[in-house]
């Protein structure tokens, strides 16, 4: 896809057209917000009920939770109160201890979405990460993920650790951590990688999933709406690349490809959605893309910054 091509996103037929063509930050971001708001409206009109959701944090930094809490339109409170019924999210749940995990177990007989961030440590039968204590017994991430995933209507991995292993599974990987799809040995999982995942992507994916079902995904299980185009194609510094004018050090305004930027090989929505509903994103802050949404991050994308040109 060339840099001047419009990105096309499949949306339902009732939106008057089968393709929604977007070529600007505003139009793409507007579509994502529409998806979340459409899900909320369906609940209000009684077309759909609020689906239960369990969000489990296993082994990782949980930057995805901080990212989610920074969502602005819709914000996380509106999302949780209007179109998903969040049963459990350890970082923000009021309940603690056995009471909290009991609610998780009670939800397993209902229709629910399972969201998970972090990788699963396998060493020593999973004892490197425990997520709860129940009836006097420690519940490992291995056990919890396997238990919750079994009856879930949909599974979404939030973040690169959950999706591909990410930093948690990076060398030397002393805990023998693996991604959720690898642990469960399933290929029907929706992956939303990112370090962290942008809340716009999470909100949009949840909105689409609750209103229309499984979105169109690429060969890695990532929704094409957010991972269907190279960062390079929408980068504000692309003109410098085309002119073969490259930055020599961090802080220069030119293309950072010679400094190790992975934008030309990384498929993500970053230049358009950006972060915190602002113009904030890595390249905009003079930091090369490190390819954090890909399956080889971080070991396969190092060094993140290099000097000395090509």
Question: Which residues does each predicted region cover?
Answer:
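Iron-sulfur-associated redox domains of electron-transfer enzymes in respiratory
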Residues: 10, 14, 18, 22-267, ...
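Intrinsically disordered, low-complexity sequence elements enriched in Ser/Thr/Gly/Pro
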Residues: 1-2, 26
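Long, low-complexity C-terminal extensions of enzymes
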Residues: 262-308
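Secretory targeting signals
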Residues: 2-12
């Amino acid at each position: 896809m060339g840099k001047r091509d419009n990105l096309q996103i499949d949306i339902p037929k009732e939106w008057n057209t089968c393709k929604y063509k977007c070529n600007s930050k505003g139009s793409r971001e507007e579509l994502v917000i529409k998806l979340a708001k459409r899900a909320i409206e369906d609940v209000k009109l009684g077309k759909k009920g609020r689906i239960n959701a369990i969000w489990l944090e296993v082994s990782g930094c949980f930057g995805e939770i901080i990212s989610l809490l920074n969502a602005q339109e819709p914000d996380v409170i509106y999302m949780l109160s209007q179109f998903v019924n969040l049963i459990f999210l350890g970082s923000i749940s009021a309940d603690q201890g056995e009471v909290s995990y009991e609610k998780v177990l009670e939800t397993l007989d209902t229709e629910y979405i399972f969201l998970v961030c972090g990788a699963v440590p396998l060493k020593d039968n999973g004892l490197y990460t425990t997520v709860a204590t129940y009836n006097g017994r420690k519940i490992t991430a291995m056990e919890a993920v396997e238990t919750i995933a079994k009856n879930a209507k949909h599974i979404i991995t939030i973040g690169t650790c959950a999706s591909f292993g990410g930093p948690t599974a990076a060398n030397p990987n002393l805990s023998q951590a693996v991604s959720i799809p690898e642990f469960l040995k399933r290929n029907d999982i929706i992956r939303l990688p990112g370090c962290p995942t942008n809340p716009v992507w999470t909100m949009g994916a949840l909105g689409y999933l609750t209103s229309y079902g499984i979105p169109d995904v690429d060969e890695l299980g990532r929704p094409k709406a957010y991972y269907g185009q190279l960062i390079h194609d929408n980068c504000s510094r692309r003109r410098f690349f085309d002119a073969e004018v490259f930055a020599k050090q961090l802080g220069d305004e030119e293309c950072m490809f010679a400094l190790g930027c992975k934008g030309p090989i990384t498929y993500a929505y970053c230049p358009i959605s950006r972060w915190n509903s602002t113009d904030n994103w890595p390249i905009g802050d003079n930091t090369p893309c490190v390819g954090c949404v890909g399956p080889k991050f971080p070991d396969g994308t190092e060094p993140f910054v290099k000097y000395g040109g090509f």
